[in-house]
Amino acid sequence: MSSAAAIIACALSLLGRSERTMPPITLVEAPPKHASIQADAFVSLPDPHIYVITSSPTFRDAMASRSSCSESATMKKLASVLAHEEWHIRNGADESGAYYAQLTTLLRLGVPPDNNVYRSVQRSMQAVLKKRKQKPDLVLAGR
């Protein structure tokens, strides 16, 4: 198993999940042109795959801090990103629902609302929802 695959396995473990119980996860180096450059992962519906961006700060931080499968804030954020993208695959394009699933996952993993990781996801949600009101996107991405 590659180091990148081990990071995904660790994030899934935090969720109490395995590769068998999640939509397929594909690692990509960079987001496509139609996705946000700040995205950690994305889906392109109706394709049922979660694409995790290995050049994202969240993934790079998880790789750098990995001595063993940890419950670091970065790993919890990555796990919540997977929950966000899975929500899209199961429920569709609604960003509000996906972000609420992500925030709920962070809470379940022990990340409190006053934590920087939780707040950064809230800020991303607000920015994405504001942008969507102005112009709908075709690609869904979690940060």
Report residues per predicted region.
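Intrinsically disordered, low-complexity segments enriched in small/polar and acidic residues
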Residues: 119, 139-141
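Post-HExxH zinc-binding segment in Zn-dependent metallohydrolases
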Residues: 93-134
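Short active-site segment of divalent metal-dependent hydrolases/proteases
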Residues: 83-91
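Active-site scaffold of zinc-dependent metalloenzymes
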Residues: 35-79, 89
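N-terminal low-complexity, Pro/Thr/Ser-rich intrinsically disordered segments
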Residues: 1-4, 132-133, 140
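A metal-dependent hydrolase signature that marks the N-terminal structural subdomain at the beginning
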Residues: 1-48, 67-68
